[in-house]
Amino acid sequence: MKFLDQAKVYIKSGDGGAGSVSFRREKFIEFGGPDGGDGGRGGDVWVEAVNGLNTLIDFRFQQHFKATIGTHGMGRNRAGAKGADVTLKVPVGTQIFEEDEETLICDLTREGQRYRVAAGGNGGFGNAYFKSSVNQAPDWANPGLPGEEKTIWLRLKLIADAGLVGLPNAGKSTFLAAVTRARPKIANYPFTTLHPNLGVATIDGQEFVLADIPGLIEGAHEGVGIGDRFLGHVERTRVLLHLVSAQEEKVGKAYKTVKHELEAYGNELTDKPEIVALSQIDVVDEETLKKKKRELARACGKTPFLISAITGSGMTEVLRALRDIIVEANGGAGQEAPMKALKVRHRDMQSSGNEGESEDNSDRDDEEQQG
């Protein structure tokens, strides 16, 4: 399935139904009086976070969503029915913005969370509503009020516990494939990864979600390469795993390049706990490895892990370090994976793989009864 993390959609809630002008007509009742009912309220437009989705690709093919109008009022004081609602199903982690792309309407971070982004118009009053002591037979009614019509943006930020960052070909996708059942595209050329990938890793019986994003290069915050937009998918993570390839001629510079892009992106990414690892150590000799380890340690101010996703060297230690930070960030308790956890096992490491309203599902029945 193709990945799409941003979509522009046009929504319109239903217009309210018109009130009815009607008079009671029965045998032997000469002056029955008005009995026109009120019009029904127009349908609402909702967005709802559901599991099982990790892309907004469906909104590439359908961008217009319109709720139905309320039914008009009828005689005998019969009110019109409410128009049918429209619900946009989106992945957990989707943010809804106004047309300016800056004003946040809501952030759907839990399964079943719903938000009303456009309220239906109220139905008009029937002529029975206007009956008074001075006007016993009003012959007018109100039209229904129009619904809301606007453009909104959907922006997906994947929910994961740990995020992988680094230059292109730093071994991020290989790492993800080695410790989870994710199967990202892996090749020996830059920008093999063009969209984020998720996988569930297990270490010592505990699970957490890893997010792999496309590589960053110098100037990514200015649009160089494929830019830095995908960094939004690691904003929600508890920890970043920064991979630097041992094949880089200057590993210290490679580390600082990515660090600079994280700072330029902002949103407190540089404030997150960071684990630094020198990857692909199986392709360099021992003397070169020692030299690059010292250089990277000077650049990042800490001792980097040494790992190889091919031989499995150092992988368990890195996973445990990630797990420990995630557990600590969640109050010291075991973390339940933010996505539905899959039962996975490691590959053999020794082998060579405000108009709106929000609600949860638990509140939905109460709201419908009140409506």
From Swiss-Prot:
The encoding gene: obg
Name assigned to this protein: GTPase Obg
Localization of this protein: Cytoplasm
Main function: An essential GTPase which binds GTP, GDP and possibly (p)ppGpp with moderate affinity, with high nucleotide exchange rates and a fairly low GTP hydrolysis rate. Plays a role in control of the cell cycle, stress response, ribosome biogenesis and in those bacteria that undergo differentiation, in morphogenesis control.
HAMAP family: GTPase_Obg
Domain OBG-type G: 160-327
Domain Obg: residue ranges: 1-159
Top-level enzyme category: hydrolase
Protein's organism: Rhizobium rhizogenes (strain K84 / ATCC BAA-868) (Agrobacterium radiobacter)
Comp. bias (Acidic residues): 356-371
